[in-house]
Amino acid sequence: MSSIADEKYRIADHDIWVIPNFAQDVLGVDPAVLQHELENNYPVRRRGDVIERARPQWVEGDNEALHYRGRELKRGKMWFQSGEPQMEGFVKYYYTGWQRAVLPATSDVARAPELVPVVEKYNTWASERGNPTANHFIVTHYVDGEHNIGMHSDKPKSIRPGSLITVIKTGEHGRPFRLELLPKEGEKTGAVLMDRVLPPGTAVIMTLEANLATKHGVPAVSHAGPSGSVVLRTIDERVSWAQLDTELAKFYASKKRKVDEY
């Protein structure tokens, strides 16, 4: 097994660690201030709004580019990567519900000065433990208890072997976080490993292998204050600016055909 942190933070016998005050103690950042700055310093794209390519921006769940199977998502997101997309291509992570239409929203993290020291300190921490440095970062906000993310495992398709998957809880309020094993044959749900409120600044860190053996999520609750997260991964796949133009043209042509046929 890996040795990422003190054994007291390990969840059961899995390579998953829940570390309190990680943002404050390791990254040197106040999770409430970080979320506040990210919420207030960048534009928001809602229903009908056009995404500005390769610039920091919030894309809310009602924006068509973020719809999953035609439905709005109950959360808003920002995407960042290491390197300018126009020069180095867009880092492509196949998260659940991913669509080509939202890839242009990915910005070089250097354009978000609030995140730069977070990424630098995290990558130093990861390197010291023999893990790859992260190059892809998703920021999420949950405005209330209705905002949530369902139980899922991160898709491994473009995640580098050896990558850690690190969730850092941000904002002023804690929020329940659930971890469970994959269900055994004949079962609908797996055994629950953890289901508790994680205070701001807490990190959930897992190996790719542990991710594939489990599911995690932020369940909907009746009452919750605003909260958020930053998720860091190491991704191997990139799509060039020109290639994305081609893929988007095909994507929108296909959508138009489906509408015309309907």
PLM region spans:
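Non-heme Fe(II) oxygenase metal-center motifs and adjacent flexible, charged/small-residue loops
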Residues: 1-262
